[in-house]
From Swiss-Prot:
Superkingdom per UniProt: Eukaryota
Disulfide links within the chain: none
Protein name (Swiss-Prot/TrEMBL): Coiled-coil domain-containing protein 138
Keywords, comma-separated and alphabetical: Coiled coil, Phosphoprotein
Residues annotated with Phosphothreonine modification: T48
Coiled coil segments of this chain: 198-323
PTM sites of type Phosphoserine: S49, S469
UniProt key word Glycosyltransferase: no
Length: 665
């Protein structure tokens, strides 16, 4: 940006008027030089002082200062002019101008700083004006001298003299000086106006400076606020990131929990489907059995009706044959009397060794065929062996169905047989009954089984025997055959199991379970329990419907869990689907007695120690039921809590510290 030179208003006009008035312009070569001198001097000042131009460029203050300097330069030749006019008159004006020109030229060559030289010349010119004014005005009055001196000392102050006094002063001065004075007075007024403008501009600059300071402070406050906002934004972003991470972790945790719940739901659904299929199968079997029972009832009624018809026909034919005989009535009476005691006539076999031979065969069949059926079933592989074995099993079951009524009838002869032969006979009956468990229920066997159970429970009592030979006669002495109440432990144990299989009366079953618990307290009783595979017999009564017997059933199983050599075989015998299904159904029963639950938890705790049983626990969801019972059980029931925690720990569902915490209270 180039510096801007501001000239005081009217400067060029004043200089030109002075030049024209004093004959310095135009025709005279000397005057031409004088004007050229001032022009060249002015141009040189504006071009040779870049520092001053840089300082005062583009500013009103700078322009006003330049104007004051130039006015001083204009007054310098005028001051010298006043001096030469007063001393040498007007004739020597040109010489004084030429001398002044030479003097200023020498000063400009010597001086380095233009601003210093101009200030010195200005001060010198004012002093010369004062010196010239003093001798010229000695003849005038004192007020006029004071007025002139005041005007010379303070050219920037406004003139306070009235116009009349100024006119008087002009009249006393020469005409040219008066004009110069007027022009100087006008310049003075203009300078005052410029000073006022400069003061006003300075005030505006001060206001602008204060405004800029306020804006700067406001800007600083805004910057501080922005910095605080940035800090808050960073903190908000950090908190948001933390919350986002927490949210992601929580979502992941809930996703895992949802997956576990879905797995558990799938397991429950599969178990429910399995139970539903089993229920449908049982319903189908029940319908088939009902249909078969209905057909058999119809057939039995037909047979009974036919039998009645045959009896009537036989009686009618007999009467017709004996019609002419006088003994007809007597024979009819004898026939009726013979029909009743036919079933009650007991005859002793001529050879007692036949029973011994039969008992040997019974032992052999029981030990090597009937009792081995389930073991062979578990060992079969492939479809053909299974089909072959199924046919064999059906044949065995049919034979057992045919033999059991005959065996029940033979119980009436047991009082007349050696007591040692009772055990093989009862064992054969027991294993025949066990064969019927795997097959369909036979409605025709209901009455036979009930009679068999009552005879085994009560025993057989007979008054005596009759022999056809007149040589032998036996006194009618009562004889008994005790089975359930026998003093022989193996016979009593087998009789108890038969009673549990056949009898439905609650009082008979309660006495049977009491006898079984007493027998299981001995080591021989536990061995017999395992030998005769009594677990399925006991499990048939382990249901919530028989609440009165439930405690006795659990007690009999609990006797087998006592530490002995029979414990491990008993646990292996219980490690099957039948036992775990029965326990699962029992645990689902609402409001199960606390004592029964504690006893059952002991058995489950011992079964959980076998690793292979973990699959059975999971298959029948017993572990979930135990967890639910553990959650809802009162902590005051410490024994139950300890057993549940131990069972869950063996299954790998809880940690060791849970056992310690539960046992500590």
């Amino acid at each position: 940006m180039e510096p801007r030179v501001v000239k005081p208003p009217g400067q060029d006009l004043v200089v030109e008027s002075l030049k024209s008035r004093y004959g310095l312009g135009g025709s005279c070569p000397d005057e031409y030089d004088f004007s050229n001198f001032y022009q060249s001097k002015y141009k040189r000042r504006t071009l040779t002082s870049p520092g001053d131009l840089d300082i005062y460029s583009g500013d009103k203050v700078g322009s006003s200062l330049k104007y004051s300097d130039e006015s001083k330069h204009c007054r310098t030749p005028l001051g010298s002019l006043f001096k030469h006019v007063n001393v040498n008159c007007l004739d020597d004006e040109l010489d004084s101008f030429h001398d002044l020109k030479k003097q200023e030229t020498e000063e400009e060559l010597i001086e380095n700083d233009y601003r210093v030289s101009t200030s010195k010349i200005t001060k010198q010119s004012f002093k010369e004006i004062e010196k010239v004014a003093l001798p010229t005005n000695t003849t005038s009055s004192r007020p006029r001298t004071e007025c002139c001196s005041d005007a010379g000392d303070s050219p920037l102050k406004p003139v306070s003299c009235p116009k009349s006094k100024a006119s008087d002063k002009r009249s006393l001065l020469p005409h040219q000086i008066s004009q110069i004075y007027d022009e100087l007075f006008q310049i003075h007024l203009k300078l005052q106006c410029e000073t006022a403008a400069q003061q006003k501009f300075a005030e505006e600059l001060q206001k602008r400076e204060r405004f800029l300071l306020e804006r700067e402070q406001l800007l600083f406050r805004h910057e501080n606020a922005l910095s605080k906002i940035k800090g808050v934004e960073e903190e908000v972003l950090t908190r948001f990131q933390i919350i986002k991470e927490q949210h992601d972790a929580e979502v992941e945790h809930l996703t895992e929990v949802l997956k576990e719940k879905n797995k558990e739901t799938k397991r429950l659904r599969s178990s429910f489907d399995a139970l539903k299929e089993l229920n449908d199968t049982l319903k189908k079997q029940l319908n088939e059995a009902s249909e078969e029972n209905r057909k058999i009832d119809i057939q039995a009624k037909r047979v009974q009706a036919r039998l009645d018809n045959l009896q009537r026909k036989y009686e009618f034919m007999t009467i017709q044959r004996l019609k002419g005989s006088s003994h007809a009535v007597h024979e009819m009476k004898s026939l009726k009397q013979e029909k009743a005691p036919v079933s009650k006539t007991y005859k002793v076999p001529l050879n007692g060794q036949v029973y011994e031979l039969l008992t040997v065969f019974m032992d052999w069949i029981s030990d090597h065929h009937l009792s081995k059926v389930k073991h062979e079933e578990s060992g079969m592989d492939g479809k053909k062996p299974q089909l072959k074995f199924a046919s064999q099993r059906n044949d065995i079951q049919e034979k057992c169905v045919k033999l059991l009524p005959l065996m029940t009838e033979q119980l009436q002869w047991m009082p007349f047989v050696n007591i040692k032969l009772h055990e093989p006979f009862v064992k054969f009956i027991y294993w025949s009954l066990r064969q019927l468990d795997a097959g369909a229920q036979h409605s025709t066997m209901t009455s036979t089984l009930r009679r068999l159970g009552e005879d085994i429970f009560k025993g057989v009592v007979t008054k005596g025997i009759q022999d056809n030979s007149p040589q032998h006669s036996v006194e009618n002495k009562p004889k008994t055959a005790a089975f359930f109440k026998s003093s022989n432990l193996p016979l009593r144990f087998l009789s108890t199991l038969i009673v549990l299989k056949t009898v439905t009366q609650a009082d008979y079953l309660a006495q049977a379970f009491d006898s079984l618990c007493l027998d299981l307290k001995t080591e021989e009783g536990k061995t017999l329990f395992l030998e005769y595979q009594a677990v399925p017999v006991i499990l048939s009564h382990l249901r919530i419907s028989s609440k009165g017997l439930l405690s006795n059933v659990i007690d009999s199983l609990l006797q087998m869990t006592v530490e002995s050599k029979s414990l491990q075989p008993f646990l292996e015998a219980c490690s099957n689907s039948l036992f775990f299904r029965t326990c699962s159904v029992l645990l689902r029963a609402p409001k199960l007695d606390l004592q029964i639950l504690e006893k059952l938890s002991i058995i489950l705790q011992k079964l959980s120690k076998i690793k292979s049983n973990k699959k059975l626990f999971e298959l029948f969801t017993i572990h979930l039921m135990l967890q639910e019972i553990q959650r809802t059980t009162n902590p005051e029931h410490a024994f139950l809590c300890i057993n549940l925690n131990s069972t869950l720990f063996n299954l790998g569902l809880t940690k060791c510290n849970s056992l310690v915490s539960s046992a500590s209270p």
